Amino acid sequence: MKKQVLFLMVIGILFSCSNDDENQPQTIDMRINHYQNTGIGEGLFLTLLVQENNNIGSDSWTKFYNSIEGFNYQPGFIYNIKVIVEQVDNPPADGSSLKYTLQEIKSTQEVNYETPFDIDLKINGQSFITTTSGYELLDQIEIDCNNLCDELDTKLQNQDFVIGTFKRLQSNEIQLIELE
């Protein structure tokens, strides 16, 4: 009987020890959309839009607030990439607990400049439009508001949520074609 109890205790101890699989680097597939969207974290950001693993090819895109070490994103292209995801020991209070590193660019597909896409211009009263030198998204992407400048100003003043539909003019310049 004592041997059985001892055996069960040893088995219990072995199974209770953590394997720390969570801390092992993982490799995942990602698809990165051809345009960035806006987001709110510890401030206002331009975010990549991504799909991971089984979600690749779906209509669902997630805002990605991290960076991918070794990846040089260029607007106007959809990227299929493979990344290594690692746990960060003792991450900063305002930082991520995950580190993403590019392992491989599997494919790159250029998207037609006429392809429309939506960007959140204002979320919960927080506007992402800056006017330091014309209309821009967070002083990073120029916006040609076309004949919609007055409507854009009015919506930014009076609505808590504003979404713009755009098309690409150049790498870092987009044209507003519709507002909601």
Model-derived regions, located:
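Positively charged n-region of N-terminal signal peptides that target proteins for export
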Residues: 1-4
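C-terminal motif of bacterial Sec signal peptides marking the signal peptidase cleavage site
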Residues: 13-16
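Bacterial signal peptide processing site
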Residues: 18-21
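Structural detector for short beta-strands of small beta-barrel domains
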Residues: 23-45, 112-130
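Intrinsically disordered, low-complexity linker/tail regions enriched in polar/charged residues
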Residues: 36, 40-61, 85, 137-142, ...
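N-terminal post-signal-peptidase region of extra-cytosolic proteins
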Residues: 60-70
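Flexible glycine-rich surface loops and low-complexity tracts that mediate binding to linear polymers
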Residues: 79-88, 158-170
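OB-fold/S1-family single-stranded nucleic acid-binding modules
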Residues: 92-112, 170-180
